[in-house]
């Protein structure tokens, strides 16, 4: 799986996708997995074997994608086999602190989204009016567990939290407010500023959400990120692979 350079490196991240999601994003690109339950059932033993196989294939880390509702099974699998690799918890940010505390000591890297700061937008676009407060509390817990980011000699993240934010069309003001809050509340935590929003699914029928973001929209948010000195990654708009640049 391709992620930010400090996660994907040269050999890729060993992604394990879990069916289902607590959000109902109108622009979700993985609806078959997140909302329609596509996937196959595996036991904790088989999951532990998948971890081993990804390790043997050379993955830089084990990347657990939307695993919140399978945390007990994930912990059982890690008890059976703990790879000698960082464990990445790849999250929408819509997580309970109680669930995250179960992962304390098991997860090395948290990769949460920080999608919304406006409850009305969170309700309209993801069906979760409480997302801003829930995500902020969740990220605070993630940062508490991991502390400041730690990298190896090749720039690979070995421990830490990397916050992702996707700029949405017409909502640059909200994006700037999110970056401001990250700067104030999570100093030293890197941010991945994403610009690859692609209208799909229900978003195609929603005025304002039925287009990609404009370069000037992304540029405005990026300029703020640079002005306040937030460390992290930006995305090259229009690049075939949506490449991230440190």
Residue spans of the language-model regions?
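Conserved Radical SAM active-site core
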Residues: 1-110, 118-120
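Aromatic/hydrophobic pocket-lining residues that form the small-molecule binding cavity
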Residues: 47, 74, 100, 135, ...
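Auxiliary Fe-S-binding modules of radical SAM enzymes
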Residues: 147-246
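Conserved radical SAM core fold
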Residues: 34, 71, 94-96, 114-132, ...
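Conserved glycine-rich "GG(E/T)P / GGGxP" loop and the immediately following alpha-helix
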Residues: 55-77, 124, 130, 140, ...
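Alpha-helix-loop-beta-strand connector modules within alpha/beta enzyme cores
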Residues: 77-88, 137-142, 215-223
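Anionic-ligand binding region
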Residues: 122-154
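Hydrophobic faces of well-ordered beta-strands that scaffold small-molecule active sites
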Residues: 14, 62, 87-89, 110-112, ...
């Amino acid at each position: 799986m391709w992620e930010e350079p400090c996660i994907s490196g040269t050999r890729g991240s060993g992604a394990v996708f879990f069916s289902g999601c607590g959000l109902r994003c109108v622009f979700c690109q993985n609806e078959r997995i997140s909302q329609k339950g596509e996937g196959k059932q595996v036991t904790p033993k088989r999951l532990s074997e998948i971890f081993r196989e990804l390790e043997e294939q050379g993955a830089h880390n084990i990347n657990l994608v939307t695993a919140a509702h399978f945390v007990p099974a994930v912990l059982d699998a890690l008890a059976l086999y703990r790879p000698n690799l960082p464990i990445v918890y790849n999250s929408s940010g819509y997580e309970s602190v109680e669930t995250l505390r179960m992962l304390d000591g098991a997860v090395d890297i948290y990769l949460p989204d920080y999608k919304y700061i406006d409850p009305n937008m969170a309700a309209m676009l993801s069906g979760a009016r409480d997302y801003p407060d829930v995500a902020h509390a969740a990220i605070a817990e993630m940062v508490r567990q991991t502390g400041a980011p730690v990298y190896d000699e090749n720039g690979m993240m070995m421990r830490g939290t990397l916050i992702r934010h996707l700029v949405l069309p017409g909502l640059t003001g909200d994006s700037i407010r999110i970056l401001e809050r990250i700067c104030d509340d999570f100093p030293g935590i890197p941010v991945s500023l994403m610009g690859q929003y692609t209208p799909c699914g229900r978003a195609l029928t929603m005025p304002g959400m039925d287009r990609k973001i404009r370069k000037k929209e992304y540029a405005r948010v990026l300029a703020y990120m640079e002005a306040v000195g937030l460390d992290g990654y930006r995305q090259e708009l229009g690049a075939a692979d949506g490449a991230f640049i440190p």
